[in-house]
């Protein structure tokens, strides 16, 4: 088995392999990166995708990215590991473990002080892999998903607009204030935000929104349309999920529930900043209506349980999924603090 850096010409083979590797336990889906395999990794400034090969055949892949983030009151280089998958024909042969070793070697060479990964609830094989590799469960986060199916009244709608380049300094200041004291937050600036908007697929000024009052920005949110980054096709629902879906439809809480054959359209909230949760709530309602017009079925984010962000989602039909944050220090003197953590939404 050979582990190497993925090349642009690997894209189609990786997409075909990815489609053969279902994800999930209760809602089982097939995911394929769009429009090419590497678009998902372009959300990061310094990504690296690796592939495992048996002769000339790709049998597995994993990705990582390096960024600056707060760890224990210091801004350090950290690695994020994501999109591990192995061909069904090569499971239990150590493919993921070999990819993991390659990623850690790369992160160490790049002087990353810590690595982290997000693992969905119930994904026991991934949890066991990372625990064997020296990671520990740091926190159980939550991924709240708002079901988008009806228009809602938006207070202060006249004060909501897309951002303009002139707003970047104020938005950066608001983000830094909102997430001050949070582990894994990457302090930002107007220049950093401008570079992100230019680099990240599907992100532009039109889908970064602000709520303002007398020229003062009170809240901001970015909209990352996952349906343009990844095709998510429903393959199967377990019994519990099928029963839940029927109950929600019968009770008229939802007009319909995902079923096999559906392609999910989802939107991630990112770059969330606010003076108060009360300022964020109108933006969430505005996003709901915007998503409804564009055929988006779920809007979600990642945050701490009990985070103030959840207050802005009151009144919506919401399904919460647990997401486990695993961390591993790569330097002896580094330790993530026990305080709250910040997840931007790109890490999913």
Model-derived features with residue positions:
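Short, high-confidence coil segments that cap the C-terminus of an alpha-helix
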Residues: 47, 110-112, 206, 293-297
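Active-site/acyl-donor-binding loops of N-acyltransferases
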Residues: 119-122, 128-155, 220-348
